[in-house]
Amino acid sequence: FSNPNTVRWYQDKISELIRMGVSAIKCDFGEAAPYNGLYANGRTGFHEHNLYPLRYNKALWEAVRNSSPNQEGVIWARSAWAGSQRYPLHWGGDASTNNVGSTGMLGDLRGGLSFGLSGFSFWSHDMGGFVTESPDDLYRRWLPFGFLSSHTRAHGAPPTEPWLISESFTDAFRECAEMKYKLMPYVYAQAKLCTEQGLPMVRALFVEFPEDAGAWLCEDQY
């Protein structure tokens, strides 16, 4: 993405999809640009590694925006760097299907809180995790977390469609989905506020309660 000709070629391909009716494009990976690579601008990956996802986000976001009716559309990006705040939105990548350590549901929340403190208003995650089949109890617990995030997605390597799990799980999924639809006026209002004031939708507690010493130590609530 340091080559303008490549960017134009890529954007033309994306624009064809948008004109077909696609409204969102997944901006996957982007964080693995090799340090020893040589880029079109003559610089090595040592200098370009972090710029790669920024340029990737920008190229895709511009293609989606410029090809969409009323300049609407969204990217669903995994990698980012300083400046990617302009190109919403991002998600937490491939989470493990557990609730321990730094890679499962708790790790996703920690990442989302950190992301919000870095100036990103919108952030999402894969409900239930991605890597392996999610345990029923974990996926159920992940549902309200996912539906009460700004953008909601169920996605994973094994199928995550609720009707493939059980009837009772489908009922729980539907209940959370209906809850979010009822809350959409509030969600839209908060989204507008966040874009105007630079706030994250998922906020670390000390953003709202800076005088509370305990809020500065809390990493599993928002």
Where are these regions (language model features)?
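Catalytic-domain carbohydrate-binding cleft regions of carbohydrate-active enzymes
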Residues: 1-222
